[in-house]
Amino acid sequence: MNFKYIVAVSILIASAYARSEENDIQSLSQRDVLEEESLREIRGIGGALLSAAKVGLKGLAKGLAEHFANGKRTAEEREVMKRLEAAMRDLDSFEHPEEASEKETRGFNQEEKEKRIIGPVLGLVGSALGGLLKKIG
């Protein structure tokens, strides 16, 4: 008789353990889903900020290009213009989607372009604005 009780208690313990394992797996799955949703939201916000920055930089670059096109330019200003034009071409390439076969590498390529473009563009815009302010002042 004691053997039956031992077996019954063992089965109860095993089923309780199995249920706790299932609950742990479900809670981990729910956490993973929530983390993925959070990452998607963060990427969406980052993409929106990047789009706004691109539009602002493109407008600023076009304004600077028009300003520099109207007057005589020094060698330094010509170099700044060449860099701005290159940056504009790179920014335009962000807006044109690649073929479906290249979608997997697009995210990596876009991150590399962003790293390569945003730093120098901000430096160029700063130096161009500084030069413009020196001329005005």
Swiss-Prot record:
Main location: secreted
Chain spans, region Disordered: 91-112
GO BP, one annotated term: killing of cells of another organism
Expression (tissue specificity): Expressed by the skin glands.
Leader sequence segment: 1-18
Modified residues (Asparagine amide): 70
Residues where D-allo-isoleucine is found: 118
Localization, UniProt: Secreted
Superkingdom, taxonomy of origin: Eukaryota
Keywords noted in UniProt: Amidation, Amphibian defense peptide, Antibiotic, Antimicrobial, Cleavage on pair of basic residues, Cytolysis, D-amino acid, Hemolysis, Secreted, Signal
InterPro entries: Bombinin
A cellular component term, taken from the record's GO annotations: extracellular region
Keyword Lipid biosynthesis part of the UniProt annotation: no
Annotated positions of the Isoleucine amide modification: 136
Function: Has antimicrobial activity, but no hemolytic activity. Preliminary evidence indicates that this peptide does not lyse and thus kill the bacteria by its antimicrobial activity.
Family designation: Belongs to the bombinin family.
This protein's name: Bombinin-like peptides 1
